[in-house]
């Protein structure tokens, strides 16, 4: 891939991405796409934007393309968890971009579509995915849990758990699942995710 001129402060890489991928229940596919990767911040602060620029993927929501033309590679927190605490651009491409493109190639071939699962569009999809990540069942529980996780840990641990068990957050089993995610996710990640879903809060 080559570096191309871009907006001030953004690193833009454009070129062909070749890959060979396979998953259980679907065939191996070797393919290539022309993509553009815009990196505005270090990976530990913000995820890159990725665009398919060869004209193969329609710029429509049904193909998991955002209104600005970038590929919807999954929720922000899910991508963060996939990448781990020390993300690299190579990991980002291998673990987030290639699975998306592999899914599209399967769709083109008529075999199947997005074997790794699909989120609903917009806020509804984010809520569904974050409920799975944190082990809560509805939006209200998610909002209250993410509010706790956005606090300093010492303060949040002393408050009552949002599940209604009557225990302090630190003593509840919900705490263990939530803080397993927090080993990778920062408070800034949580706050940004909250703003995506509830921008007025």
Where are these regions (language model features)?
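Acidic/negatively charged segments and metal-coordination signatures
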Residues: 24, 77-201
